[in-house]
Regions:
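Conserved N-terminal catalytic core of the sugar/cofactor nucleotidyltransferase
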Residues: 8-15, 26-105, 111-115, 121
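Short beta-strand segments
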Residues: 1-2, 51, 102-105, 135-139, ...
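General beta-strand structural signal in soluble alpha/beta enzymes
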Residues: 50, 73-74, 103, 134-138, ...
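Short coil/turn connectors at secondary-structure junctions
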Residues: 45-46, 68-69, 96-99, 129-133, ...
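Residue-level signal for inorganic ion chemistry
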Residues: 32, 88, 107, 150, ...
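Conserved core of the sugar-phosphate nucleotidyltransferase
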Residues: 113-233, 253, 330
Length: 352
């Protein structure tokens, strides 16, 4: 899944080039390319399916020249993750009715890739033998308010644990309770399933989607697929896979994992990943000098050498990209979407 805007990373992530297409760490590979590299060790290249917004077709093909245009499913508009995954499932079933599928966002970071590879193989092997949905749950290391959580029961099967509930992003006090209880895992947003298992779940829990996608039966994995789905996609419900299916289904298992995972959804998550110690400053794509300043993250997007000097500022996001300079307290970063919306309204979308 690679069609989001990444608005919480504004102004570095923009409508024209969202964060999944950016080389955030200066490695020469974007988050999308790093995700592709990671899964290429497990999945044949010809079996990849990228669901993205139609606007990003050329960007995807430019960054992933290994893929054919037919491996891209181009959404004419954003309708959240349930329609995205639903369309991909119908497409894959038309090509292979017995396929086992792993779903992943395009913008996550994995530090221990060997451990990750084994977890993916384990999940795919499980769903090939069991009519269950398997999500990957990350063992929490801190009381994190930026992630959803999965509560587990004590019922296990070969390392897989029965899911009790899915919980949305908690406040700090509740996140501390979750951590101390030992009953909760971070929801990584990655899950595996057999194609028929997830189709059955969609038909049972989200018939408002399947009734629409069923109209295209006979055209999936054909040259006219894009045209037919594009004509009906606006009718699909705007809902996440978690709300639509996973929170309702009674056949969801979780594989607890620990492979150095991070959902790079916010400046705060990037700061936590890059900081050397508590209250340290972080500078990306620039040289920096700090005086009486701590807990800041700086990101400068520009050509050539750059230097930023910061004095007397604590716990801030300082980011410059494509004509926009953002200075915002890290504790207020949930307002970045608000800032972006106001800028779009006042300045005719020049800074989206």
């Amino acid at each position: 899944m690679g069609g989001g805007v990444g608005s919480r990373f504004w102004p570095y992530s923009r409508e024209s080039k969202p964060k999944q297409f950016l080389d955030i760490f200066g490695t020469g590979r974007s988050l999308l390319q790093m995700t592709f590299d990671r899964f290429s060790k497990v999945i044949p290249k010809e079996n990849f399916v990228i669901v993205t917004n139609a606007t990003y077709r050329d960007l995807v093909l430019e960054q992933l020249p290994e893929l054919q245009p037919s491996q891209l499913l181009l959404e004419p508009m954003r309708r959240n993750t349930a329609p995205c995954i639903g369309w991909a499932t119908y497409h894959i079933q038309a090509k292979n009715p017995k396929a086992n599928i792993i779903v992943t966002p395009a913008d996550h970071l994995i530090l221990q890739e060997d451990v990750f590879e084994e977890a993916i193989k384990q999940a795919l092997a499980f769903v090939a033998q069991h009519p269950q949905l398997v999500t990957l749950g990350v063992r929490p290391s801190r009381p994190e308010t930026g992630y959803g959580y999965i509560q587990i029961t004590g019922e296990t099967e070969g390392g897989f644990v029965q899911v009790k509930t899915f919980t949305e992003k908690p406040n700090l006090e509740m996140a501390k309770v979750f951590l101390e209880s030992g009953e909760f895992l971070w929801n990584s947003g990655m899950f595996a399933r057999n194609v028929q298992t997830i189709l059955d779940a969609f038909h049972r829990y989200l018939p408002s989607l399947t009734s629409i996608l069923d109209e295209v039966n006979g055209h999936y994995a054909q040259s006219e697929e894009q045209q037919h789905v594009g004509a009906i996609f606006s009718q699909c419900p705007n809902i996440s896979i978690d709300y639509a299916v996973l929170e309702k289904a009674d056949n969801v298992m979780v594989l607890p994992v620990d492979f150095g995972w991070a959902d790079l959804g916010t400046w705060g998550s990037l700061y936590d990943l890059k900081k050397a110690e508590d209250k340290a400053n972080v500078a990306l794509h620039t040289e920096a000098l700090f005086y009486e300043a701590e807990g800041n993250i700086i990101s400068m997007d520009g050509e050539g050498d750059q230097l930023v000097v910061v004095q007397g500022i604590n716990d801030c996001i300082i980011s410059q990209s494509n004509g926009v300079l953002l200075i915002c307290k890290r504790g207020e970063e949930q307002r970045i979407k608000e800032f972006m919306a106001e800028a779009s309204l006042r300045f005719d979308k020049r800074y989206d």
